[in-house]
Structures are given as C-alpha cells and as structure tokens.
Amino acid sequence: MYVLKNGQVLNASGELENKDVLIQNGKVNLIADSIEVTSGEEFDATGKLIAPGFIDVHVHLREPGGEHKETILTGTQAAARGGYTTICSMPNTKPVPDSKEVMESLQAKIKETAKVRVLPYASITTSLGTDELVDFEALKEAGAFAFTDDGVGVQLAGTMYEAMKRAAALDMAIVAHCEDNSLIYGGVVHDGIFAEKEGLKGIPNIAESVQIARDVLLAEAAGCHYHVCHISTKESVRVVRDAKRAGIRVTAEVSPHHLILDEEAIPGNDGNWKMNPPLRSKEDRAALLEGLLDGTIDFIATDHAPHAAEEKNVPMEQAAFGIVGLETAFPLLYTHFVKTKEWTLKQLIDWMTVKPAECFKLPYGKLEEGSVADIVVLDLEKEANIDPATFYSKGKNTPFVGETCIGWPVATFSEGTLVYNEGEIK
C-alpha cells in the first residue's frame, strides 16, 4: 500500500488540483484532498504531477532472437523509466509469434522478466511478410493483443482483405506498417531535399499513402478495425481523415520524432537519423501536427526500435532502420509542445494514455478511484539532457543526444508496485 502525498492531478477540465492518492491491492483506492497515512508507505509527490501510466502500442522488444539489441527485461526497464506501464510488443522477432506455441512461450518469458505490462502482437502472416495467414483464432486464445506484420507492409490486397475478415470475426484489430514494396526504390531516407543533397535513394510519400488508401477500403468492406502505424505523410493524413468522415473504423498513431523533426534537421549521413518511415518534409510534419489536433490521428506511439551500436554508427546506406523512444518521449513532447503552449498538458497526457486505451478497448489509461494503479509521477520542472549512457534500453540509437528537456518521469507504479523511482529500477 502507498499513499502519494501532496501531488497534483489533472481534472476533466485540464486544471491541476492538489490531491493525495491511495494505492491498495493494485488499485487506486482513493483520491482526496488529504489522506492520513496509517499503514503502508508514504510517497512524497510534493509539487509533482500524478498521472495515468503511459501506454505505447508500438514497441520493439527484439526478444526472442535479437537479444543483442534489446530484451524483454531491458525494454520494460526502459518503459518504466519513461513512465510507460503498458507496452505492446511487435512480432518481428525470431521466431515470429505466428503460432500458438511461440505465443505461449513469449507470454511465459514476459511473465518471468517484464517490469511492466507487455501485450504481444501476433503476426498477420506466417514468418511475417509472406502470403500465408496465421491461425487467428488460436493466437487470440493464446493472448495476442492484435495482428500486425510491422516492419513490412502486407503486399497483396487479397491477403490483407482475408486477414481483415478473420480479425473482424474475432473483434480484433489489424495494425499496419503501410509500405508498398514496389514504391520503395531501395530508399534509405525521404525522397526530398536531404536525399538529393547527399545523393541517397529516397522513399517517396506514396509508398505509404497508397497502401493506406487501399487498406481503408478493404477495412470498410471487411468491417474491421484498421490501425495505421507511424503515419508520416500529408497524403496519408488526408486519406485517414476522409476515411473517418466516411465512417470507416480506422485509427492512426504518430511517433514523437515525426512530430518534432523533419528532413531539414538531419545533420548529415548518420545512421542514427535513419528510421522507417523516414523524417519527411516540413509540409508533412505540419500535416501530422494538424491531424493530431483535429483528431484524424488518434494518439502518440514511440515505435521504440533499439539496435546495437555497430548497426547504427555507420552511414545510412548500411544502417538499420529505427530509433529508441521509450525513455525520452514525454520530456521531448512536453518540452517541444506544452512548454511552447502549442498543446495543453491534458492533450499530451491523453494522447499517451486514455486515447490509445480507448482505441484498443484497454481497461487502462485513467487515474480514478477503482482504476488499476498504473501511475507515473512527473516532475514538470526537472531539467536534464538526453544522455544515452543513462538509458536502460540496450539501444542507444537516438537523434536527440544532448538535447535539454524539461519535464521528466521520476517514479512509475505498475499495478500498484513501485517499479521505478528517482533513477532506479526496483
């Protein structure tokens, strides 16, 4: 049992109120002006924000098969430090969770080592990136969160349509990395001014938007919840906006780096700036920000993609795609958008908590009496530099090295258990 004393909570209007919070038996038992500590532990939250634990539906934990990049343990330690209490792990592992047996093995490993809640995806196709569909029903029974071939797009419309019909029958979501392989052209960055300046092959916007346009029509026909991963282009935003207006059940996420950076920020041919989708144009970034504010884009997800140093500290042509994000998402977004008054604090918290929970019908993401005690304590005055040497993640691959941010998670509770406190994993 914990009593969080003298903290602040956001009310429904987005105003800060001074409150104490009682955690008992893994639940939020009481939120009140003052709670007397008669047993359990007192946690001093003076001057700090007590918020729901963050939810990230797009995380690469790499285990099994990629333990040199990340493990379930290190990835969930990173999540705890970043204030995340629920993360959803992508299936581009070896082996792929494409069968009941592999999924059950993965679930056992999660139960054994994870520091926060991990909800694993199953793949859409066997081995991921094929045209043979998995056994959707068996994988749902084994605990799959949803179905995705993230890392690659499902190339054949017929394969995707059949997958959507099967998912819809089970009331499960299809989550899509949208990329038409015939339109990538071997690109390593956005097909724009940086690619031209550096003489690099570029990935055009249409590689993403064409597949989203196809998929929203398939989702409409199948009656399926279709979720777009890491949306990155103005055309994609337009397609999703039109689909929502048409009543199609489509949701979308955007990553912090696509909101903060564009291709003009890339300093040179450095693999730590290589990600998929790539950093796009200024116009694309503006469309993402507009789409998030008008509800076209539903929430924020990190696409945390750790790699070993030797896979990133090379030119872009040789580097792996992806950057880490779990430990830096909140401070970056708070600094860039809340401190600058572009967003309210409530908007940011909602996009990291209740919005993803609502999209995927998760019973998390709220701080209220009776809710699961997934809680992050945030020091909105704390100022620190982003230093990969302090990361719990094995991946140190971030383009934000050295950036000064204000507003950091200082403690995280997962189902009432203190898992991170003042720089230390419990």
UniProtKB/Swiss-Prot annotation:
Biological processes per GO annotation: 'de novo' UMP biosynthetic process; purine nucleobase catabolic process
Sites where the protein binds Zn(2+) 1: H58, H60, D150, D303
EC number per UniProt: 3.5.2.3
Taxonomic superkingdom: Bacteria
Cofactor(s), names only, from the UniProt record: Zn(2+)
GO molecular function: allantoinase activity; dihydroorotase activity; zinc ion binding
Active site (catalytic residues): D303
Sites where the protein binds Zn(2+) 2: D150, H177, H230
InterPro entries: Amidohydro-rel (IPR006680), DHOase (IPR004722), DHOase/Allantoinase_Hydrolase (IPR050138), Dihydroorotase_CS (IPR002195), Metal-dep_hydrolase_composite (IPR011059), Metal_Hydrolase (IPR032466)
Cellular component, GO annotation: cytoplasm
Cofactor note: Binds 2 Zn(2+) ions per subunit.
Pathway assigned in UniProt: Pyrimidine metabolism; UMP biosynthesis via de novo pathway; (S)-dihydroorotate from bicarbonate: step 3/3
Keywords: Hydrolase, Metal-binding, Pyrimidine biosynthesis, Zinc
Catalytic reaction annotation: (S)-dihydroorotate + H2O = N-carbamoyl-L-aspartate + H(+)
Keyword Hydrolase carried by entry: yes
Annotated binding of substrate, by residue: H60, L61, R62, N92, N276, H307, F321, G322
Record's function text: Catalyzes the reversible cyclization of carbamoyl aspartate to dihydroorotate.
Assigned protein family: Belongs to the metallo-dependent hydrolases superfamily. DHOase family. Class I DHOase subfamily.
Protein known as: Dihydroorotase
Naturally occurring in which organism (per UniProt): Listeria monocytogenes serotype 4b (strain CLIP80459)
Taxonomic lineage of the native organism: Bacteria, Bacillati, Bacillota, Bacilli, Bacillales
